[in-house]
Amino acid sequence: MSVQFTSEHVCYVNCNYCNTILVVNVPNNCSYNIVTVRCGHCTMVLSMDLAPFHQARTVQDHQVQNRGFQGNNFGSYDIASRNQRTSTAMYPMPTSQQQVSPIRPPEKRQRVPSAYNRFIKEEIQRIKTSNPEISHREAFSAAAKNWAHLPRLHFGLSVADGGGGGGSN
């Protein structure tokens, strides 16, 4: 076993939002009292107080550092400016005392509907208001046919140009 002294110190931080353990490399010459860490799992920003780290660092300077826990098992990090959203403490943990929490998947984010989906939805509503007796399937089919003729207008081409739509001209 070889002793490695690096210019960084490894700390483990628990994200308060998704309960992911983050591995944070803090430079030994870091003069900030508070740094910001972004969780790579849920993108939550955590403000870290380095005062306990600076006190504990002097005790642990003689221990072996960076024992191979820099992989992706603990999420990722991003040390940014002093932007504070959530406050939490950061304590360096010896590698023999680390605790692995179960990692929950991030919540699904609502995506913005595509132009096609918006067009089809609006077109089905338009077709059904003009003809309430039509089935949803028939309205969808008509809307899809309308979309097939529409793209040449979206690309800045006029009907007179005769280009664009992928139909047989």
Swiss-Prot record:
It comes from the Eukaryota. Keywords: Developmental protein, Differentiation, DNA-binding, Flowering, Metal-binding, Nucleus, Zinc, Zinc-finger. One of its GO terms (cellular component) is nucleus. The keyword Zinc-finger applies. It is found in: Nucleus. The keyword Zinc-finger applies. A zinc finger (C4-type) spans 15-42. InterPro entries: HMG_box_dom_sf, YABBY, YABBY_C, YABBY_N. GO terms for biological process: abaxial cell fate specification; cell fate commitment; specification of floral organ number. Belongs to the YABBY family. May play a role in floral meristem development and maintenance of stamens, rather than in determining polarity in floral organs. This is Protein YABBY 1. The lineage of its organism: Eukaryota, Viridiplantae, Streptophyta, Embryophyta, Tracheophyta.
